[in-house]
Swiss-Prot record:
Protein's organism: Mus musculus
Subcellular location(s) per record: Nucleus
Region of interest called Required for transcriptional activation, as start-end residue ranges on this chain: 1-51, 466-553
Modified residues (Phosphoserine): 237, 243, 274, 320, 521
Low complexity bias: start-end ranges: 243-254, 262-291, 356-372
Motif (Nuclear localization signal 2 (NLS 2)): 168-176
Tissue-specificity statement: Expressed in glomerular epithelial cells, the podocytes. Expressed in a population of adipo-osteogenic progenitor cells, termed CXCL12-abundant reticular (CAR) cells (at protein level). Expressed in many embryonic tissues, including prechondrogenic mesenchyme, periocular mesenchyme, meninges, endothelial cells and kidney. Detected in adult brain, heart, kidney, adrenal gland, lung and testis, with lower levels in stomach, spleen and thymus. Expressed in endothelial cells. Expressed in the mesenchyme adjacent to the developing cerebellum. Expressed in the sternum and rib cartilage.
Gene name linked to the record: Foxc1
The name this protein goes by in its record: Forkhead box protein C1
Function: DNA-binding transcriptional factor that plays a role in a broad range of cellular and developmental processes such as eye, bones, cardiovascular, kidney and skin development. Acts either as a transcriptional activator or repressor. Binds to the consensus binding site 5'-[G/C][A/T]AAA[T/C]AA[A/C]-3' in promoter of target genes. Upon DNA-binding, promotes DNA bending. Acts as a transcriptional coactivator. Stimulates Indian hedgehog (Ihh)-induced target gene expression mediated by the transcription factor GLI2, and hence regulates endochondral ossification.
Keyword annotations from UniProtKB, A to Z: Activator, Angiogenesis, Developmental protein, DNA-binding, Nucleus, Phosphoprotein, Repressor, Transcription, Transcription regulation, Ubl conjugation
InterPro entries: Fork_head_dom (IPR001766), FOX_domain-containing (IPR050211), FOXC1/C2-like_FH (IPR047391), TF_fork_head_CS_1 (IPR018122), TF_fork_head_CS_2 (IPR030456), WH-like_DNA-bd_sf (IPR036388), WH_DNA-bd_sf (IPR036390)
Amino acid sequence: MQARYSVSSPNSLGVVPYLGGEQSYYRAAAAAAGGGYTAMPAPMSVYSHPAHAEQYPGSMARAYGPYTPQPQPKDMVKPPYSYIALITMAIQNAPDKKITLNGIYQFIMDRFPFYRDNKQGWQNSIRHNLSLNECFVKVPRDDKKPGKGSYWTLDPDSYNMFENGSFLRRRRRFKKKDAVKDKEEKGRLHLQEPPPPQAGRQPAPAPPEQAEGSAPGPQPPPVRIQDIKTENGTCPSPPQPLSPAAALGSGSAATVPKIESPDSSSSSLSSGSSPPGSLPSARPLSLDAAEPAPPPQPAPPPHHSQGFSVDNIMTSLRGSPQGSAAELGSGLLASAAASSRAGIAPPLALGAYSPGQSSLYSSPCSQSSSAGSSGGGGGGGGGGGGSSSAAGTGGAATYHCNLQAMSLYAAGERGGHLQGPAGGAGSAAVDDPLPDYSLPPATSSSSSSLSHGGGGQEASHHPASHQGRLTSWYLNQAGGDLGHLASAAAAAAAAGYPGQQQNFHSVREMFESQRIGLNNSPVNGNSSCQMAFPASQSLYRTSGAFVYDCSKF
């Protein structure tokens, strides 16, 4: 008798029932030697006992292969192809794309060893499939090639019978009448084809309606390829002769133009150090560079106040990611600015989540600097607003922390004269106009002090705050990165209204727990929730919103 008893590895001897000292000794020796049990005549009678033979059937005895029936090799497994697929393979493999029945049998047996057995069963199925399926056509044999048996070939309409050329998946059962019907439809479509290019060109001027409320600009009558390229959701509108920074710097809500073409805004933002007004240098980057530049179309303020619905944002997001994101960036700046001036809360901006605006997540200062670009010029609320934004405008082009810090320190120095005038509303309204990760306008400046120094004093009209939260909680930046920003904010607060320092510290105490829980940086005075409060008492009523806001992230 051969040993029916085996273990999968020498170390797993615990599987074996204990059979007495002598046998366990032999077992251990055999395992150590890596040999089989047949070398030991003594225990053999024990192992070949019928009970053990049943307990450890042959399926477990693979460790000692020679003594067990060999498992089926892989090619003996039935191939996953249907008989239709097998016949199709054989026909397509034949030189003339036609083959006899015997040729089909031979091809299948050569290719798939599984079919070398039980020939009668599967060959019957092959014949059955050949006669039953309309995709296989019998071609009578001509006299040039003597022999017996007709040729089989594929119906020309059935070549796309399998999905993506994979024989594993068939689209549907091929029927001749369906194929004829499809052919007729194709013929009809072919006759009607000349008009469709016209129809394809019609929608090009339509996107102004798609983006709700965007100012429809004059379209040049000949539709060129550049326009059609941008047709997928963004508006291929006439180029604006102003860059976003210069356009937003125009100062009053009524004349803030909607930056429509994504390429104009993205090109001017990406042109790095070009000064705000020098659009001609940035313009060649855009898609429709050849277009003549008509005068800018000022959008009416109502558009901005009701402006950015989710549909609008999503349609513009569908365009080229980089361009539309930049468009959203600048467009939202304008809309937030105007709507905050009109006293309407801008909805939560989805621009920050757009895939193209990777710059938002790439560096701590990028978001606030782009905000600064619009912010600065847009609200001529007191001379201070203008100068802080002048630094911010450069920041938009270069996305640089230094400019951000400069604007902070500048704002700190002029903090005193910024807080007072109602014009502060204007500059504040535009100073931080991206309400990216924050609640609506009530949450004025939980971290606006971190993004713009002036923001602390002017925050009574901020649409919402950002940058501080975004930087430390979204990017998990260490507090040290924000150190100079926060200290500058504190300086701004001190310069603006030293009398409120006690409130400042008490509020900071209130946020201690959130800072511990949410901030990766060590808990220090300059952590992310630090707030520089303006003189208006209205802010303190919304501290509940701040607590919610902090814990939310």
